[in-house]
Design a protein with these regions (language model features):
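Short, charged, surface-exposed secondary-structure boundary motifs
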Residues: 1-3, 13, 17-22, 71-74, ...
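Class I S-adenosyl-L-methionine
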Residues: 1-64, 163, 169-174
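Short hydrophobic/aromatic-enriched beta-strand-loop microsegments
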Residues: 5-12, 58-62, 81-88, 131-140
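A contiguous loop/helix-start segment that scaffolds small-molecule binding in enzyme catalytic cores
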Residues: 9, 22, 28-34, 46, ...
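Class I SAM-dependent methyltransferase SAM-binding "motif I" and its flanking Rossmann-like core
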Residues: 38-108, 152-153
Length: 200
C-alpha cells in the first residue's frame, strides 16, 4: 500500500498467493510459465512456497539454481569466502536486525551484508553493538557485478561517510564486508574484475 512503509507479512503473503494463483491459472490453460527471480530462487521463501503450491496443484516444476549476489558480489570484488568463518546477511534480515527485531552478528570472521546505502549508519551501529571494532577493515562494494562496480576499502566506522563521498543514493543497494580478509594480501592478486582493461 503506497505511503504506508514496508509491506507487512500479510501483504507479502497476499502478493505471493496472487502470483501463485496466476501461475496455476496459466498452467491450467496449457501455457508454460517461467518465473525469473534474481539470485538463488530458493533463498527466497516465497518462491519456495510458490513452487510447492504449483507442484501440489499437480503441475511440473523445474528449478534452475542461481548464484546469489550475497556470494557473487564479494567474489567480483576479489574477496574469498573460503576458509573463513563467514556470516551472510541479506537485506530483509539486515532490516530486522538493525530495527532490533533480529539477532547480533558474528563478532569474528567475515560478515557480508546486503543493504542500502542510506542504512549504513544503522548497519555500523549494529555491527559495533555485536562486538565488531570501529577500526576493523571493511569494504563497501557499490554497483556490484556491473561495469560500474567500485570497491572502497576503509574501516567499519568510515562506511557511512564513504557512501556519502561516493554520492550514492540512499536506496542504492550495496554490499559490505567486515573482517580481516578485506585486507588479506591475496585480495590484491584476486582483483580480477575491476582491474580489467577499459573497466568502468
Amino acid at each position: 500500500q503506497p505511503g504506508t512503509g514496508a509491506p507487512t507479512p500479510v501483504d507479502v503473503d497476499e502478493h505471493c498467493a496472487d502470483v501463485t494463483a496466476t501461475v496455476i491459472d496459466a498452467a491450467s490453460q496449457g501455457l508454460e510459465v517461467v518465473r525469473l527471480v534474481s539470485g538463488d530462487p530458493f533463498l527466497d521463501g516465497d518462491i519456495g512456497a510458490e513452487a510447492a503450491a504449483v507442484a501440489r496443484a499437480d503441475y511440473d516444476v523445474d528449478v534452475v539454481p542461481g548464484v546469489t549476489g550475497m556470494t557473487a558480489v564479494p567474489e567480483y570484488a576479489g574477496l574469498t569466502l573460503h576458509g573463513h568463518d563467514v556470516q551472510l546477511i541479506g537485506d530483509a534480515a539486515c532490516q530486522r536486525d538493525i530495527a532490533g527485531h533480529g539477532s547480533n552478528w558474528s563478532d569474528q570472521g567475515l560478515v557480508v551484508v546486503n543493504t542500502e546505502a542510506g542504512k549504513l549508519k544503522e548497519v555500523v551501529k549494529h555491527a559495533i553493538e555485536s562486538g565488531r571494532g570501529e577500526d576493523e577493515p571493511a569494504a563497501l562494494i557499490c554497483h556490484g557485478a556491473t561495469t560500474q562496480q567500485t570497491t572502497h576499502t576503509v574501516t567499519l566506522g568510515e562506511l557511512p561517510q564513504t557512501a556519502k563521498t561516493a554520492r550514492l543514493d540512499n536506496a542504492e543497494p550495496v554490499h559490505i564486508a567486515i573482517g580481516k580478509v578485506v585486507e588479506a594480501p591475496e585480495r590484491e592478486q584476486l582483483d580480477w574484475y575491476e582491474s580489467k582493461p577499459l573497466f568502468g
